[in-house]
Amino acid sequence: MAIRLSTAPLAAAVANEGGIGLIAASGMGLDELRKDIRMARELTGGKGIIGINAMVAARQFLDLITTAAEEGIDLIVAGAGFSRDIFAVGRRYGVEVVPIVSSARLAQTAEKLGASAVVVEGTEAGGHLGTQQSIKEILPEVIEAVNIPVIAAGGAIDGNDVAELLKLGANGVQMGSRFAASEESNAAPALKE
């Protein structure tokens, strides 16, 4: 989810419910990111899965993912571009790497480089777009192309949408925009209404 909307309170709330809580790291300073990761860990009692989402195109991308890895983050999700450097950071610190992809070919590249999973986004996704295909079109292509978990993203608003993506073969579903209105989101009150 967008810069400073998904911070420690939202990531921790998701992790406490059994999901993977992601902190939107792009746009944060390194000290702010460290503080947010530590706060999320505190809010989960050290349990649950906490990761970051970082935009490859962001100015401090490599510094952000390295800082998060040093803090013992569970996984790094990266979009808005593709980075080979992220895999070296993941290996060095033992952190799972989950790139956001928009094609079967890029998913295969990610798998060869060591991705633990991929998030595949269709045109319905709120950000990091790289395709004109809908998630329902692209998802089966990616699932067939790789042997790692495939997480669908884009257009999932409720349980029916999640169920449909799981029926199409997704191993999981990433939701972002839906959480912008949550109590734990850092979004402005006007956006939450």
Name these PLM-found stretches:
Residues 1, 155-156:
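Active-site metal-binding loops of divalent metal-dependent hydrolases
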Residues 1-149:
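Active-site entrance/lid segments in N-terminal catalytic domains of soluble metabolic enzymes
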Residues 10, 125, 132-151, 157-193:
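Conserved active-site-proximal phosphate/metal-binding subdomains
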